[in-house]
């Protein structure tokens, strides 16, 4: 009798399962584009017990190549072939037992062919900003009761302050006035993570939805509108992405699609999903208190290229989590990297971005990232991506650039970040220049290694960013700042500025990261001081803004700087000179690295000056006679054009 009852219960359970409604809660990508070189489309279907559904498609030319049933019962990967398919609305037919469901899915035409998309280059100057800290154009989206972090508090340096995309859009003319040509925002995608009272994910580096702009920044449509209007004003937009990790509140974490979706997934196993451990995970500094199964990255990037690297060092670098609240994605899983590749393509097609900045580039799997770059390069041959490669040695950085002879593997990464220049210029600012090692010798020496780079002009140089101390520290040394900017904007590099440099924003990380990510003055309606207008800026701010703006506008379209041959001279008596030459035109950057008055011995630079008798100092418009020695003020920077 008991056996009969048990059999009946099992039969009824099976029948109920077979007749249960088909649940399709979400499909990613949310829509797609026809005419891509890679005709394969991965659809990640989310829904309770969707794993065993069968799928057919009603649409001319679309073929279901495969259904991949993952470990979790709540995911199904549908691989479609769209070769030769035209745009339109197709129907996806899901069937489970006797139940079925039809879901409409839109296939769109592309706005332009991939080879028509032109990325940022060394002709641009990128202006990096943090949306939460730049301007609040819509106070109504500062906080939402439906999100885990409901706080907006400008008095707390590491909580959300309310800046948004609308605030950026309202100040597009400001960027034109300044003279920059491209904007790089820190990530704008949804970060639906809690705050612990001290820290939050206002920075955007803990993604919880790869297809949705964070509502506190705006909507997908507002992001597209911002980019469209930026393009109308001659500004490019670079999107910050993260393939290395996601946020802990991403649905993948609570319900892993496969057991190898993340690196070191042991910490996500059920026995560690207790309120106590959740609390530890939610704290940004939780690494010191978590259980021994947690593996944090060593932050040591050298093992990735080290020919003698141990397996344990590689594991700690690549597989360890960046912080406890950011689970480390396993790009070696082919379904993970396919998802991420499609996501980057979707944002290019949907929003019209002009470039990608990839966060924590070497922390992700090297081969998978190279595959992504190769695919993206084939689809968008003139697009540009810059990778964050935070090691201060040129040999390391150069090995990550596309076609490098220093690596046995091609990364296909067009642009790398120049942490070597950043490191040297921040040391030089505190030193007087001698004839060997200190001061501007650091810049001379680091540029000597440009022979290591396949393409030096596609190396992104900077003097500060959101992860470093401000160049000014806690001070206001404008002489050192002008020297650094004079070099940054004229050497054979792609230059990047950090918001607020033009109005002397300062700060160090010794206080908190938020101290180098302060709100831009005037970005909030109740600000008493606005740096967006000449009337609102102080005299010191206007002097710096005007000086930099003059230089930025001069750089626009200047082929001597973007195409010219570069020549540098060993320092002599504290003077450092770099020259650029193109089609009979010359520019000499002259840096007095001494704290006292000095002199430029023009005879030493005859190979550049030739028969020229006078030049224009771009920094102030004055005429300078160069047929005789030139007097230099303490720590002066001159940019001589002739």
Residue spans for each PLM region:
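Bacterial Sec-dependent N-terminal signal peptides
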Residues: 1-26
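Carbohydrate-interacting/catalytic domains
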Residues: 20, 98-102, 106-125, 176, ...
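Hydrophobic faces of well-ordered beta-strands that scaffold small-molecule active sites
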Residues: 127, 183-185, 237-239, 356, ...
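Beta-strand/beta-sandwich contexts
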Residues: 21-51, 109
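Substrate-binding/active-site clefts of carbohydrate-active enzymes
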Residues: 135-345, 350, 369-378, 389, ...
């Amino acid at each position: 009798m008991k056996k009969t009852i048990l059999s009946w219960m099992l039969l009824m359970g099976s029948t109920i399962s077979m007749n249960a409604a088909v649940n399709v809660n979400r499909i990613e990508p949310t829509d797609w584009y026809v005419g891509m070189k890679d005709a394969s489309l991965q659809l990640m279907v989310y829904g309770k017990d969707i794993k065993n559904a069968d799928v057919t498609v009603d649409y001319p030319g679309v073929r279901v190549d495969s259904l991949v049933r993952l470990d979790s019962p709540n995911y199904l990967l549908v691989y479609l072939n769209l070769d030769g398919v035209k745009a339109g609305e197709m129907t996806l037919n899901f069937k489970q037992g006797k139940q079925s469901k039809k879901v409409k899915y839109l296939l769109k035409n592309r706005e332009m062919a991939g080879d028509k998309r032109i990325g940022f280059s060394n002709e641009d100057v990128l202006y990096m900003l943090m949306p939460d800290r730049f301007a609040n154009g819509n106070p109504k989206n500062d906080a939402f009761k439906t999100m885990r972090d409901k706080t907006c508090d400008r008095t707390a340096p590491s909580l959300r302050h309310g800046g948004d995309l609308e605030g950026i859009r309202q100040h597009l003319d400001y960027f034109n006035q300044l003279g920059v040509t491209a904007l790089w925002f820190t990530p704008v995608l949804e970060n639906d993570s809690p705050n612990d009272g001290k820290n939050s994910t206002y920075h955007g580096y803990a993604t919880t939805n790869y297809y949705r702009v964070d509502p506190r920044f705006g909507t997908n449509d507002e992001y597209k509108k911002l980019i469209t209007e930026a393009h109308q004003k001659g500004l490019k937009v670079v999107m910050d992405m993260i393939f290395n990790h996601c946020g802990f509140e991403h649905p993948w974490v609570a319900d892993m699609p496969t057991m190898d979706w993340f690196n070191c997934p042991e910490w996500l196993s059920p026995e560690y999903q207790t309120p106590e451990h959740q609390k530890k995970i939610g704290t940004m500094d939780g690494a010191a208190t978590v259980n021994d199964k947690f593996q944090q990255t060593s932050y040591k990037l050298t093992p990735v290229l080290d020919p003698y690297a141990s397996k344990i060092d590689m594991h700690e670098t690549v597989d360890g989590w960046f912080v406890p609240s950011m689970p480390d994605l396993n790009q070696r899983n082919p379904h993970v990297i396919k998802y991420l590749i499609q996501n980057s393509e979707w944002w290019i097609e949907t929003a019209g971005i002009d470039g990608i900045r990839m966060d924590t580039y070497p922390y992700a799997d090297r081969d998978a990232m190279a595959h992504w770059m190769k695919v993206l390069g084939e689809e968008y041959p003139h697009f540009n991506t810059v990778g964050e490669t935070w090691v201060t040695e040129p040999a390391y950085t150069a090995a990550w650039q596309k076609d490098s002879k220093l690596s046995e593997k091609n990364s296909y990464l067009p642009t790398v970040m120049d942490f070597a220049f950043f490191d040297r210029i921040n040391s030089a600012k505190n030193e007087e220049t001698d004839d060997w090692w200190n001061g501007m010798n650091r810049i001379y020496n680091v540029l000597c290694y440009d022979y290591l780079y396949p393409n030096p002009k596609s190396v992104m140089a900077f003097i500060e960013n959101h992860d470093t101390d401000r160049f000014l520290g806690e001070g206001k040394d404008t002489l050192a700042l002008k020297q650094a900017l004079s070099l940054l904007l004229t050497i054979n590099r792609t230059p990047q500025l950090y918001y607020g440099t033009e109005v002397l924003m300062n700060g160090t990380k010794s206080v908190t990261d938020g101290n180098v990510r302060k709100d831009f003055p005037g970005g909030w309606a109740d600000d008493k001081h606005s740096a967006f207008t000449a009337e609102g800026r102080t005299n010191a701010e206007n002097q710096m803004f005007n000086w930099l703006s003059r230089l930025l506008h001069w750089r626009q379209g200047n082929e001597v700087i973007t195409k010219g041959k570069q020549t540098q001279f060993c320092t002599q008596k504290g003077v450092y000179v770099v020259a650029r030459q193109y089609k009979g035109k010359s520019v000499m950057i002259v840096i007095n690295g001494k704290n006292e008055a000095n002199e430029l011995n023009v005879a030493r630079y005859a190979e550049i000056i030739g028969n020229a008798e006078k030049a224009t100092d771009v920094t102030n418009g004055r005429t300078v006679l160069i047929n005789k020695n030139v007097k230099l003020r303490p720590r002066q920077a001159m940019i001589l054009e002739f």
